[in-house]
């Protein structure tokens, strides 16, 4: 899995440049020639669209305007990658809903698997044109990590505009030292991350480490390298790392539990009391309506939500899971016994608000 940011494809702040992408394309070609399967997650649609209509919008423009630029630029982005390879390049556009909904998530996995079986090169991007959440900081870094787990990748390579992770921001601190090997992403390591310094893309080093943590939970190592350096990319194509290796977690979680933990969450939460929190964390129980005190947001049945403990100290997130009932229904059955659900609602989807098989503790 290779993730490429827009700052590497439009490094002069203008449109996409084959010159900037050439080294990365050679890295891809070397891996394909070695018989490896590869998937690319590539940003750059907004930057390409901005070059088509340079006076249309600034970097900090409203989401709707940037989405329009993405619509203009996505074809340019795919054309850029297609020109480097003799094999077919497949465009795959995903949204948070595709990753949050279990059925669509599995459909995406099946499609990507078939593309790889056919010998195609999938190039993935968020569907910027319709996805409101897409244009948040670092989204494609996290997308790359989730897709890496989706296709059961061996490794995640994240091309950035510096030489990897440093002990401090090397642009502002001359004493910053490079870290070539990170056995574990501790809070101290995360604190070392600074911004990328680029005004072309939206991802900083912090989001790249968050992506590495997500990939690591699926047993996937992450490599951060300087995608602008021809020497670094050529070395990488020969399996010689010049950058930062971030080890995978020691314990790999099951595929379904991974999805529950890392899929984008619906803007909503189920609020529970201390007794329910103890049953979830200590006994591995399902969440029953009797321990529910309320619901936040307007989520629907089948949506991924957070499960939060509400007590005198406030709220804190305990778990994530797939709700069997909508927020409206949960407010009506909160504090009720499971046997009362049908009497209150006029129907029942079962005794559990969230079944333990559809729940993961955080």
From Swiss-Prot:
Primary location: cytoplasm
Family: Belongs to the glutamate 5-kinase family.
Cross-referenced PROSITE patterns: GLUTAMATE_5_KINASE (PS00902), PUA (PS50890)
Keywords assigned by UniProt, alphabetized: Amino-acid biosynthesis, ATP-binding, Cytoplasm, Kinase, Nucleotide-binding, Proline biosynthesis, Transferase
Binding residues for ATP: 3, 160-161, 202-208
One Pfam assignment: AA_kinase
Catalytic reactions of this protein: L-glutamate + ATP = L-glutamyl 5-phosphate + ADP
Functional note: Catalyzes the transfer of a phosphate group to glutamate to form L-glutamate 5-phosphate.
Protein species of origin: Xanthomonas oryzae pv. oryzae (strain MAFF 311018)
Coiled-coil region: none
Name by which UniProt lists this protein: Glutamate 5-kinase
Residues annotated as domain PUA: 267-348
Superkingdom of source: Bacteria
One Gene Ontology MF term: glutamate 5-kinase activity
Pathway(s): Amino-acid biosynthesis; L-proline biosynthesis; L-glutamate 5-semialdehyde from L-glutamate: step 1/2
UniProt-listed Gene3D superfamilies: Acetylglutamate kinase-like, PUA domain
Compartments where located: Cytoplasm
Sites where the protein binds substrate: 43, 128, 140
SUPFAM superfamilies in the record: Carbamate kinase-like, PUA domain-like
Lineage, uppermost ranks: Bacteria, Pseudomonadati, Pseudomonadota, Gammaproteobacteria, Lysobacterales
